Amino acid sequence: MEDSTEDIIKSFTLEQSPEIKPKPKSKTSDLTDIVYAMDDDSIKMKKFTIFDDKYDQNISDSEHDLTPIKRKRQSAQSAPPPPATKFSSSIPQKPTLSPKKLATSPTKNYTDHINQLRSGPNSPKKYQDDENIRSLKYEIKRLKQEQNLKLENLQHKIDYLTNERDELQNQLTSMSFENDKLTKKNRSLSHENNHLTLENSKLKTKEYSNEELQSENNKLQRVNSTLRNERDELVKDFNITRDKLKKYYDLYLHCQKAHAKEMKKRIEVDGDKPISDKPMADNSTNQELVDVLKKLSEMMIEQKKISEPSAAVEKDTTSEDKTPPIPNTANSSDTPRMVSDFLEDFIKRVFEEMSSNNKNTLSPKQAINSQTYSQPNNFSNNTVPPSQSAAYNPSNSQPAPPPQPATNFYSSSTPNTNGYNQSSQSDERPETFELPHVAKDHWLQRPTSERSTQSTKYMKMDPEDIRKLVSVITDQLKKEQKSEKPSNVVEMETPVEKCQCCHGNPRNVTDTNNNQKLCQSCLNKGDFTMSEFMGRSN
C-alpha cells in the first residue's frame, strides 16, 4: 500500500513549468504577453482536470479519510503476486483497492463528499490551484524583470539616440553656415558670370575692330620696314658723300696750293713788267659789276634785318668763325676771274628762283632754298672760296679795301652748313665729316601773308639790272676764254674718259662747249680729276 500511495502522490505532483521561449518582437503592448501567459496556464489546467477525471473512479473514499485504516494481515495461504514481467517496472500499474467502509458514516451524497474532500486544505485540487496562483505570481515577476530590462535597454537606446541627435543637430547648424557661405559664393559667381558674359559679348562685337587694328598694325610694320630700308640706303649714301667730301676737300687744298705756286711763278717770270700790259677787264665793266653787287648787297641787308627777329637760323656753337685772310692782290688780272666765278654761281641761282617765281607758287623746299641763296656753299663749283672774292675791289689800279658788313655777303653770323669751318684755309683736313647741322626753319611757321610778301620782296629786282648783269657776265666769260695761258707754263694733257651716260664714247671733260656732265654712276665711283672739278662750272 505504501508503494501505491507513493505512486499516487508522485502522480499528483506538479510538473515544472517549461521555460518560456522568447516571443518575437512585436509592436503590441505588455498586456499581450500577459494574455499569452494566461493561455498557457489554461492549457495546463486542462491537463490536470483530465487527470482527475481519469483517476476519480478507481480511488475509494477511504483513502482520503484522515482516520487510520485497519488492514488485515495477509495469510500465508494467500496467493503470491503475479510474476513481474520485464516491462512491469516501467509501466505504472493502477492500485487494486477495494472500497472499504469507514468508521464514520458516509455522506448522504457522493458528490457532496467529493466536493468536501476537494475543498479541504490537503486536497490535490486546492494544491493545484495554489500552485497555479504561485506560478502566475512568479510569471508576473519574471515579466516585470524582463520589462525593466527592456526599459533599461530602451533608455540606453534613447540616450544614445539623443546624443546622436545632438551631434546631428550640431552638424546641421555647421552645414547651415556652410550652406549660407556657398549660397553667397554662388551669388558672387553668378554676378561674375554675368559680367563675363557681357564682356564676351563686347569682345565679340569688337572682333571686327580688332581685325582692322591688326591690319593697320601690319601696314605700319611694313611701312616701318620700308623706312628702315630707306634709312639704310640714306646712311650708305651719306657715307659715299662723306668720302666724296673728303676728296673734294683734298682737291680744294691741292688747288689752293697750286694756285699759290702759279702766282709765284707768274711774279718771278713777269718781273717788273707794268701791270697795264697784262690782260685786264675794262673799267666800265668793272664799275657796272660793282654797282650791281651793291644793289644785291643792299637787298640782302634788308632781308637780313627782316629775318633777324624770327631767329630763322641758329648759330653753330661748335664751329669757330674766323675772319678770312685777304688774298694777295699784286696781280689785278685775277680779280675779274674771281668775280666771274662767284657771279656765275650766283646768277644761276637767281635764274632758278626767277623761273620758280614765274609759276606763282613756292613749295616749302623752294622757300627754304630761297633763304640759303644768301648763304651759298663754300665749295659749290668754285675754285676759290667766295669769302675771298667778296673782299676784292674790281678796279684795276687800287687795291681792295678791308671788308665791310654792308658788302660782306658771307658774314660770320652765317651758320656753317658743310660740317667744317667754311673760312679756314689751312692745309689740315677736318677731323670729322658728319652730317651738317640743320637749323630749325622758322620761316615756314610764319603766316602765309608774311611769307609771300617777304619772298617777293627778296626776289623783287629790276629786269634791266638783271639783263645788264647777265650781259656783263657773258662778256667777262668770253674775255676769260680768249685770254691764253703764258708761254712758259706747260699745258697739261686733257684727260679723256669714258662714261656710261655717254654710251662708252670718249669725252673731253675740260671742253667748255661740251655740255656733257658726269652721270650718277660715275660720281658714285669717285672717278674725277682736278681738271674735271675745275670744269664743272661749265
From Swiss-Prot:
Deletion phenotype: Leads to an elongated mitotic spindle. Restricts localization of TEM1 to one spindle pole body in a large proportion of cells. Increases the level of CSE4 protein in the cell. Cell cycle arrest at the late anaphase/telophase stage with segregated nuclei and 4N DNA content. Simultaneous disruption of BUB2 partially suppresses the cell cycle arrest phenotype.
Disulfide partners: none
Region (Disordered): 1-31, 57-129, 304-338, 355-458
Polar residues: compositionally biased ranges: 86-96, 104-122, 355-392, 407-425, 446-457
GO biological process, one term: mitotic spindle pole body organization
Keyword Cytoplasm annotated: yes
Location in the cell: Cytoplasm, Cytoskeleton, Microtubule organizing center, Spindle pole body
Name recorded for this polypeptide: Spindle pole body protein CSA6
Record field: compositional bias (Basic and acidic residues): 18-30, 57-68, 304-323, 426-444
Keywords: Coiled coil, Cytoplasm, Cytoskeleton
The organism of origin for this protein: Candida albicans (strain SC5314 / ATCC MYA-2876) (Yeast)
